[in-house]
From Swiss-Prot:
Catalytic reaction list: S-adenosyl-L-homocysteine + H2O + H(+) = S-inosyl-L-homocysteine + NH4(+); S-methyl-5'-thioadenosine + H2O + H(+) = S-methyl-5'-thioinosine + NH4(+)
Provenance organism: Bacillus cereus (strain ATCC 14579 / DSM 31 / CCUG 7414 / JCM 2152 / NBRC 15305 / NCIMB 9373 / NCTC 2599 / NRRL B-3711)
Name of the protein: 5-methylthioadenosine/S-adenosylhomocysteine deaminase
Domain of life: Bacteria
Keyword Oxidoreductase: no
Keywords carried by this UniProt record: Hydrolase, Metal-binding, Zinc
Cited Gene3D superfamilies: Metal-dependent hydrolases, Urease, subunit C, domain 1
């Protein structure tokens, strides 16, 4: 099936960050086969021509660190620091999860993400009370592209830890490269919730299965102090000593890094998922993204969970990410719009190992989103497209979402998830949680 999308302003995010003011995209099944400017002549004998009527078309957004199973916890535990937030709010509530509640929570997060323009994401979920196969089936049904990872902790006894490792290894073997749309990573939660033995086992699983690693690391000053006091090393050095960086690794946060650590991470292909809103809300600090990029670290923007954000709007994350770098460096040129967009599209895709998406070019997966600026005063005058996408747009502006060539959202309506049912069930299950 060949489809051509015509009369579009196309933000390609190719190597030149080219914006085509009047162009078209030809899609064959799940792949882009051509992106060109000008009027479309049906030389390709396409099956369908869809008039975009001047809409902006850009690559689907890529969220590099999420916890969609936590979506029912929005608004619980506001105005708290990370450690008490986890220990007194999040973990006690997660211990009450059932398989049905976990699916309802996941659906809510998926619906929010896809309707606001996210097409791919990398996720970590706490397996307590969760049917992992049901979660993966739910993500698959949404039509989104994802790496969904089972989180490991060293809670409980040594036998509990051994069982957690065994279950995680089975999960990795089951779902790594499950399909072109769905995969997983090895996901120890953090150095402060995992023993040395568990981290070493995670490194082994990643090496033996050739998977990536996803971990929270260097998120707060307290974490750095505690790990240094316990192990005599800062978190980066400690994680490296456990073997985690033998495989490409995504660290969520990286707020507290020094120059030597940034150089080390770049050398060992350790990527950073930057969560600006979450880091601000939890009082964790501001990651020095400018210094990361200058050191050669791959960086992708992320939202974290709705419990610490409190939304999954990647446009908002782009805007706050660039404004923060300008502010902390007192440099208005820091993180310009092209870079901010890259960190939410092609750069983010590279961070989580999904190079097949993130830009609109021949050979890439047909993952793209659209915005109609014609009826939106905040996007007018409409000629400064890149600026408006970073500084003025929001997830609420999304019209259409195409993932792998399929219309997942069209004219604002999600075709893969039942919005009315999901919102009803989210409220019902939330009422059952005991705070």
């Amino acid at each position: 099936m060949k489809t051509t999308y015509v009369n579009a302003t196309i933000v390609t995010m190719n190597e030149q960050n080219e914006v085509i003011e009047n162009g078209y995209i030809i899609v064959e099944n799940d792949q882009i086969i051509d992106v060109k400017s000008g009027e479309f002549a049906n030389d390709f004998e396409v099956d369908e021509v869809i008039d975009m009527k001047g809409k902006w078309v850009l690559p689907g957004l890529v969220n590099t660190h999420t916890h969609v199973v936590m979506s029912l916890l929005r608004g619980i535990g506001d105005d708290m620091l990370l450690q008490p937030w986890l220990e007194t709010r999040i973990w006690p509530l997660e211990s009450q999860f059932t398989p049905e509640l976990a699916v309802a929570s996941t659906e809510l997060g998926l619906l929010e993400m896809v309707k606001s323009g996210t097409t791919s994401f990398s996720d970590m979920f706490n397996p307590i009370g969760v049917d992992q196969d049901a979660i993966m089936e739910t993500v698959s049904r949404s039509g989104m592209r994802a790496a969904v990872s089972r989180t490991l902790f060293s809670f409980g006894t040594k036998d509990d830890e051994k069982k957690a490792i065994e279950e995680a290894e089975k999960y990795v073997k089951r779902y790594y490269n499950e399909s072109d749309m769905l995969t997983t990573m090895v996901a120890p939660h953090s150095p402060y919730t995992c023993s040395t033995e568990l981290l070493e086992e995670c490194a082994r699983i990643a090496v033996e299965n050739q998977t990536m690693v996803h971990i929270h690391l260097s998120e707060t000053e307290r974490e750095v102090r505690d790990i240094e006091a316990q192990y005599g090393k800062r978190p980066v050095e400690y994680a490296a000593s456990c073997g985690l960086f033998k495989r490409p690794t995504v660290i969520a946060h990286g707020v507290v890094l020094n120059d030597d650590e940034r150089a080390f991470l770049a050398e060992h292909d350790v990527r950073v998922a930057h969560n600006p809103n979450s880091n601000l809300k939890l009082g964790s600090g501001i990651a020095n993204v400018k210094a990361m990029l200058e050191a050669g670290i791959k960086v992708g923007i992320a939202t974290d969970s709705v419990a610490s954000n409190n939304n999954l709007d990647m446009f908002e994350e782009m805007r706050i990410a660039t404004l923060l770098q300008k502010g902390i460096h007192q440099d208005a040129t820091a993180l310009p719009v092209e870079t901010a967009l890259s960190l939410a599209t092609k750069g983010a895709a590279e961070v989580i190992g999904m190079k097949q998406t993130g830009s609109l070019e021949a050979g890439k997966c047909a993952d793209f989103i659209t915005i109609d600026p014609s009826n939106k005063p905040h996007l007018q005058p409409a000629d400064e497209v890149l600026s408006h996408l970073v500084y003025a747009a929001s997830g609420k502006d999304i019209s259409d979402v195409i993932i792998n060539g399929k219309h997942v959202v069209w004219n604002g309506e999600c075709k893969t998830l039942d919005e009315e049912r999901i919102i009803f069930e989210a409220s019902r299950y939330k009422r059952g949680l005991q705070r």
